[in-house]
Design a protein with these regions (language model features):
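Generic structural signal for well-ordered, non-membrane alpha-helical segments
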Residues: 7-10, 14, 46, 50, ...
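Alpha-helical support elements that line or immediately flank enzyme active sites
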Residues: 7-23, 249-266
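Hydrophobic, small-residue-rich transmembrane alpha-helices and their short perimembrane loops
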Residues: 228, 232-250, 284-292
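Hydrophobic alpha-helical bundle architecture
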Residues: 17-20, 260-273, 283-298
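Short, small-residue-biased leader/transition segments that mark boundaries at the very start
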Residues: 2-4
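Hydrophobic, membrane-inserted alpha-helices
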Residues: 37, 279-283
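Early transmembrane hairpin of solute transport permeases
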Residues: 11-101, 107
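Signature of multi-pass transmembrane helix bundles
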Residues: 89-235
Length: 298
């Protein structure tokens, strides 16, 4: 799995370190856990038309605002992207693996000028700062009091609870789940109109769907789900509804259900309850996978 959220978390950590430095960094050192490094290295960064960690790091330093959290690059402009490209070309960024750590989600950033240094560390959660320092002065040093395993196990879900809730909960209390259908289907339909990522969904919807895979509900499920993921992974400015913090998991939990329901004439209530069952099942499974898996969560 490659994840935009991981790239943006790196940009957030860079922004915090740069803000703490109080000046435009001359050098930026980024140390990442293996999972973050692998997940973030090949995804599109929204609003830039570019792929990879260097542009996320550069923009985090140049225009990032840590107060925006995972919208840290909200103020990105074409001019900022050009400045970021120059920052990269000047070889001011060094990205490497953080050795000898067990934390799957770990981001350490050191920003430097000629006479100042600032460090920020995110660990355990994509917006969880555990350490901030400027020069030799520690500004934040917060060790996690709850292990990842304990935190993930806390809801105590099981499949019977998930199933019973999805089938018996008052309809008006779970109607909000239709927002996942609206947003994620719109993302797929937008992807069909353009060329995003590998354009797998668009390709499946064309000749391959009709002549190779067959024009069936199953091929339609594949094309819609792939198209929405194409747009998201390419960094398109298209909103999707996530599940457990993952856009791809949200798409995968939503679009197969939506396409099947539409093509089989299911009622709105059946769609709502099926979507709720699907999304809660993903959350139940995610408890066992942990916060950040090295494999694709979808």
């Amino acid at each position: 799995q490659m994840c935009i959220r991981d790239s943006i978390a790196v940009a957030l950590c860079v922004a915090k370190a740069a803000e703490t430095l109080g000046a435009k960094p001359e050098k930026i050192e980024v140390l990442l856990s293996a999972n973050i490094l692998k997940n973030a290295m090949g995804v599109g960064i929204p609003g830039t038309g570019m792929v990879g960690l260097p542009i996320a790091v550069a923009l985090g330093a140049l225009i990032g605002k840590s107060d925006y959290q995972l919208e840290v690059l909200r103020d990105c402009t074409s001019e900022a992207v050009e400045q970021g490209k120059l920052f990269i070309a000047e070889k001011r960024i060094c990205i490497s693996l953080k050795e000898d750590i067990t934390e799957k989600l770990y981001i350490e950033v050191i920003c430097k000028t000629e006479d100042k240094t600032a460090k920020a560390i995110i660990a355990g959660g994509h917006t969880t700062f555990i350490y901030i320092a400027k020069n030799e002065q520690t500004l934040l040093d917060k060790q996690q009091t709850v292990s990842e395993e304990e935190e993930e196990a806390s809801p105590e879900l099981n499949l019977r609870k998930v199933y019973d809730f999805a089938l018996t909960a008052p309809l008006d209390e779970i109607r909000f789940i239709l927002d996942t259908a609206r947003l994620n289907k719109a993302a797929a339909e937008q992807a069909f109109k353009g060329n995003y990522g590998h354009s797998l969904g668009k390709m499946l919807r064309g000749t391959y769907e009709h002549k190779v895979m067959g024009d069936s509900v199953f091929s339609h499920i594949l094309s819609y789900t792939s198209a929405a993921c194409d747009a998201r992974m390419a960094g398109a400015m298209i909103p999707v509804m996530s599940n457990s913090g993952s856009g791809n998991q949200g798409i995968s939990a939503t679009l197969p259900v939506v396409v099947f329901a539409e093509e089989n004439g299911k009622s709105e209530e059946e769609l709502i309850r099926a979507l709720m069952l699907s999304h809660l099942t993903v959350i139940y499974i995610k408890q066992s996978l942990g916060r950040l898996s090295a494999l694709c969560g979808c």
